[in-house]
Amino acid sequence: MAVVVKLSGRIFEDEELVLKYAEAIKSYGVKIAVVTGGGELARRYISAAKRGGASNTFQDLIGIYASRLNALLLISLLGDAYPKVPTNIEEFLEAWRSHRVVVAGGFQPGQSTATVAALVAEAAGASVLLNAANIDAVYSDDPRKNPKAERLPHLKYDEFERIVRSSSLPGGYELMDVWSISILRRNCITVYIFDGRRPEHIGAILRGENPGTKITC
Amino acid sequence: MAVVVKLSGRIFEDEELVLKYAEAIKSYGVKIAVVTGGGELARRYISAAKRGGASNTFQDLIGIYASRLNALLLISLLGDAYPKVPTNIEEFLEAWRSHRVVVAGGFQPGQSTATVAALVAEAAGASVLLNAANIDAVYSDDPRKNPKAERLPHLKYDEFERIVRSSSLPGGYELMDVWSISILRRNCITVYIFDGRRPEHIGAILRGENPGTKITC
Amino acid sequence: MAVVVKLSGRIFEDEELVLKYAEAIKSYGVKIAVVTGGGELARRYISAAKRGGASNTFQDLIGIYASRLNALLLISLLGDAYPKVPTNIEEFLEAWRSHRVVVAGGFQPGQSTATVAALVAEAAGASVLLNAANIDAVYSDDPRKNPKAERLPHLKYDEFERIVRSSSLPGGYELMDVWSISILRRNCITVYIFDGRRPEHIGAILRGENPGTKITC
Amino acid sequence: MAVVVKLSGRIFEDEELVLKYAEAIKSYGVKIAVVTGGGELARRYISAAKRGGASNTFQDLIGIYASRLNALLLISLLGDAYPKVPTNIEEFLEAWRSHRVVVAGGFQPGQSTATVAALVAEAAGASVLLNAANIDAVYSDDPRKNPKAERLPHLKYDEFERIVRSSSLPGGYELMDVWSISILRRNCITVYIFDGRRPEHIGAILRGENPGTKITC
Amino acid sequence: MAVVVKLSGRIFEDEELVLKYAEAIKSYGVKIAVVTGGGELARRYISAAKRGGASNTFQDLIGIYASRLNALLLISLLGDAYPKVPTNIEEFLEAWRSHRVVVAGGFQPGQSTATVAALVAEAAGASVLLNAANIDAVYSDDPRKNPKAERLPHLKYDEFERIVRSSSLPGGYELMDVWSISILRRNCITVYIFDGRRPEHIGAILRGENPGTKITC
Amino acid sequence: MAVVVKLSGRIFEDEELVLKYAEAIKSYGVKIAVVTGGGELARRYISAAKRGGASNTFQDLIGIYASRLNALLLISLLGDAYPKVPTNIEEFLEAWRSHRVVVAGGFQPGQSTATVAALVAEAAGASVLLNAANIDAVYSDDPRKNPKAERLPHLKYDEFERIVRSSSLPGGYELMDVWSISILRRNCITVYIFDGRRPEHIGAILRGENPGTKITC
């Protein structure tokens, strides 16, 4: 069983959390491809670049470099990961053939790391994508504003896409975007969205549980 | 003045047309970045791959290889183009610094060549993108079905996006997609859509004319 | 047992045939290195390039790109092939160490894909090269012109080279050239030439049969 | 005149400072090679890696990635810098031939960025290295502990090396190490050490002033 | 005027000679592409490899590495050469666009450096190839054996090819082979063969003289 | 058990010796990383470069190319070595994951091959480094000058470093330098220094003997 884990860049703000994710990944014997976001590091550097007049292209490249630094940190904590951070899908494919774990950051400007995670899932032939997100599940509305917002443990892709397009979901773009959704949907990949502060959910999901939201086609 | 020219892959079905585009590009002294689609060649190979069970990832890679073959053909017809086909935005940036003309195909799965053209325009700091398309202009409706369809020589991005989202525009995805539109819009790049069978329109546009549709922010 | 299969580019004109070759390669458990020619695709693009004044260097590079597109198509149809198209012999060697199947196109201008196949056979330590050719066997004369032309099921390298040098053999250069012959001969690699429209001959040859011509040192 | 500027990684903690250095580099028309350290970013990530049991090799690679992120940020703020971060001296040489400004981070484990700056100075044929340091000059003793410490505006390499070897100099290793000193000395490169919080000192030094310490052979 | 200079590897046995060639290349302001052979260094290493059972592939690769070491030495003696040794024709093309001098060694197994020189001449659009050879001119027969051997200052390609094919020419294969001859002939490149121990002949040839043998189409 | 073997470049002056080392490496089933020096070949080429005014950077690069030619020769004599010469630590790490034997030369200017051997030992997680040196053991003084010099079969790192820093040890820099010593010490890697003309000592050391000097932390 091959799974893809998308780690929100925010996880890398918390050293403890990164170490726990490394432990989790080491402990489960499945083939795992991890995609890391750039997080606060990326935002900080992009903000400085923007202030100084950098082009969007360079802002994107900076975000990618930040995500790769996060990826390399995770690699350094694992024993058997491919020792480099692949920079495009062909490098990923090559590494995936002979390593149990491969960790990537961004690939190219114009693609969010959520999209990269979806492309990696497609390339890896993974049937499952675990999204360690900034929210603990998908809700019908922003639970921080609307106490009546309904927690949605199961969604079909159509429903999920509708919610993502609306602006009521916190995390918005960083959770998923319509592009990544379309790639995942066309391969009928099941997505689990769970609270990124809870690495133990990876084990729970691999055992068949659903600690957050499960999206199917 | 730096311009980007997006050449629909269909142009490469017609040897005469390719030769004329080469002549046009050689004759105008401006800095030009060209992005070539995969065309019928890509479609044919992708169809064979699909039949044989190839993954979407490989189908995309095949389309990219086809677009790069088209790009190389064009390079071979120009005297002063960067002699290689850049495979990502950093290679493009590097080549663009020291060559008047750079010709690219696709970069990575998950990005249409329309998106690549938009990213290249952004990276090149181009103010204008010329789209040698499969239609001669943008219409309010499909002119082949509705004789009353109105030819639209000038559009704002909002209007253009609305039309693209609707299914009434022939060419649809291959013309532009919402992703490329958003990249172009955020850099306020002017887009000219014209009949790809008329290479002479490049000169017309450079002279300030508008033979098809002009889209501005 | 490691074998090399040289696929004439013409095979890629026929979708059915490509799919059958993929099946054949998947079914035999031996280590296989495949080298694909550029075929009609290459000829068409080279012709356009030549018309437009492209240098011989670029014409050769175009032929190489075409052969690599064919190679990638084949890779996409196999499950366990090295996922990239090696571009030189060192990349081939690296891939060959850890993959059952590796598919290459051309390497460098100045080398026919027949020569590349010979170099790959040498590098792979293969004892056998299967040439899926445009003719079904080697004849003493062009059988299409001379009905008395003798079919030659067994040849020594000397005899084969004499026939290749003479102009009576259809296919001529695309079959083999003196350079590839000398590389094969110095490693004493056995060559089987068979009808490229008959993928089932691969299995026959692996079972010890000789459906066309067998060349030994 | 070609100069090398070594920017302590700490500069990248201060967005204002980075923007000012970008302005300074843009304003002086000389050929400039910049080498950026990893700073606090590197230390933070290396510390996390170390906690999790990462090898020294990976700790070094993480430091290098951090320094390259800093380098890329600086590149994004300049208009005419080589658009990539060279990863070794040959890439640097290639970029240096055709760009006024090149910005590098670390190259390989086992080399401090101070050493990289020295190697780059040697490769670039620079006669001057400007070290934007964590101290404002070299002192005979640690001025923070010994109020009688003497500020040393001029030093010969011998004297400087003696001071670096002793532990009384704050900044120690990050300022310079004996390896970088030997490389600089053998090429008789003049080093200016100045307060890294004062980008305007670059201009002063280029005008012939000495705001901190000047080291000559 | 662009010229290609082929330097026999034997030149690199003589330090004085290498230094003189560097001076010659520096002094003439024309665009020069140099291709260096592996010489005695290659022969010694290949012999050791062969003794130890190395494959032909590796023997060829060793010869290529040796030729590249020679190339790098020459680069180090020139001020404005492309700072790297291109490893294939595309790298050569890229370097040739922006450097007055480019120095290459071998490219791939299966190609003599004479062939590489011919391919480089074709790619560079050079009209002239200067072959600093192991003989001082072409003779009708081996002058060391037949005192009546006629020195041939002018030859057409047909005549030259006939002589090369016969075994009477000393140097034989290392001078030129039929493959390089065919590439040179199809581009109508003029070849000058002269005594490799006389670097001053380069200047003579550039001035219109013919110190050895001149071959034209 | 993973070991690193550092082969002095002088070994490559003696064809017999190289063949014996190849045999030794093939016969022991352990994972071995080999680092080869440039030897006399490097010295000869560097001397020529220096005479002609080459920069230190190019002198170092020439030394690296020479060491890589030696590495390739050794690779060609082994059956299962990674088929390429890694050029930096990341390439080494990648190769080391899937090959029993990897052979490298130098990586970057500014690092002796002794330092590269130490970095490779650190990256490979090796506990032992075997240094096939130009001396048969470490002595308290130069045994060629002082007949009373004491042979030292066992040393701690402190003692060894003291001896290396003093000028009394023949071989000096080429044996080890303080930089490599510090890398080895921080990983507590045991070093065996033995007579490089005696390949059979590798087997002896693997069997637990100490034919020369053993250095521990």
From Swiss-Prot, chains A, B, C, D, E, F:
Keywords: ATP-binding, Cytoplasm, Kinase, Nucleotide-binding, Pyrimidine biosynthesis, Transferase
Source species of the chain: Pyrobaculum neutrophilum (strain DSM 2338 / JCM 9278 / NBRC 100436 / V24Sta)
Homology family: Belongs to the UMP kinase family.
Enzyme Commission identifier(s): 2.7.4.22
Biological process terms in GO annotation: 'de novo' CTP biosynthetic process; UDP biosynthetic process
Keyword Ribosomal protein belongs to the record: no
Entry binding sites for ATP: K6, L7, S8, G9, R10, G39, R43, N134, Y139, D142
Protein name: Uridylate kinase
Activity modulation: Inhibited by UTP.
Principal location class: cytoplasm
Matches recorded under PANTHER family: URIDYLATE KINASE (PTHR42833), URIDYLATE KINASE PUMPKIN, CHLOROPLASTIC (PTHR42833:SF4)
Functional pathway: Pyrimidine metabolism; CTP biosynthesis via de novo pathway; UDP from UMP (UMPK route): step 1/1
Domain of life assignment: Archaea
SUPFAM superfamilies: Carbamate kinase-like
An annotated Gene Ontology molecular function: UMP kinase activity
Summary of the function given for this chain in its UniProt record: Catalyzes the reversible phosphorylation of UMP to UDP.
